[in-house]
Amino acid sequence: MPVPSVTVTTDNEYEDISSFSSIDSYKPEPFTGFKDSEAPEQPLLKNDTIVGKGQLEDDSNVDDQHRHSDVHSHHSSSTLKRPTSNSIEKMVTHNALEGNSETVDSLKEDGLNLNKKALPDITAPVTNSAHDAAFPEEYRLETETGLVKLKTLESLKREDSRVSSTKKEHINDHTDMHSTRSKVTTNSQGSSLEPNKLNMAVEKNKKRIEKYQKHKSEKGIKGFFHRIFD
């Protein structure tokens, strides 16, 4: 009976898989963005629905008014997706090459006077100095709000800018009060300077001084009671 032959295979006959390491085959390259032909075909999202190519062709007339005419891109301003940095760079570069960007020369060509002062601010009558009045609304603001410039107050020699009936009433009340106080003060001063009352006050003070001089040298309980009750 013949003996069947047995073929023995060793590990040396197989290729070493360690030579297929991904580290040896990897070559890093900078990402420069997709080209128009290589860009992945992704459906555009619009109004929470997926829009296919067929529907996009039907709605091309509507979408054309929203698309950027100067950018060859599949992005639309009506989509919910944000434009990538690559598309933005292409847009800026395209506009710069086509001369669609604003420069000093282009503004001059459009008729813009770069030396002309801009329109004054609405708060200019209140915040600027007195000689910078640019429009007559300043005087209306002064009349209605009382926000008068310091220069105007100095020229009027006034401390308050508000002029109204309530202000006049307040001035009258203040004048009446001042006159009343003046009368009271005058009456009190006149009554205190009468000769009889003045002599009585002098005599009273003289007696108090004499008692003080009499008892100031006394000591003990007697002197204490004299100084208090005398």
UniProtKB/Swiss-Prot annotation:
Residues with Phosphoserine modification: S106
Please give the GO cellular component terms listed in this UniProt entry. Answer: cytoplasm; nucleus
Region spans: Disordered: 1-88, 156-203
- Per the record, the domain of life is Eukaryota
The alphabetized UniProt keywords are: Phosphoprotein
**Positions with biased composition (Polar residues):** 1-11, 79-88, 182-194
Compositional bias (Basic and acidic residues) at which positions? Answer: 63-73, 156-179
Q: Which named protein is this?
A: Uncharacterized protein YGR126W
The root-end lineage is: Eukaryota, Fungi, Dikarya, Ascomycota, Saccharomycotina
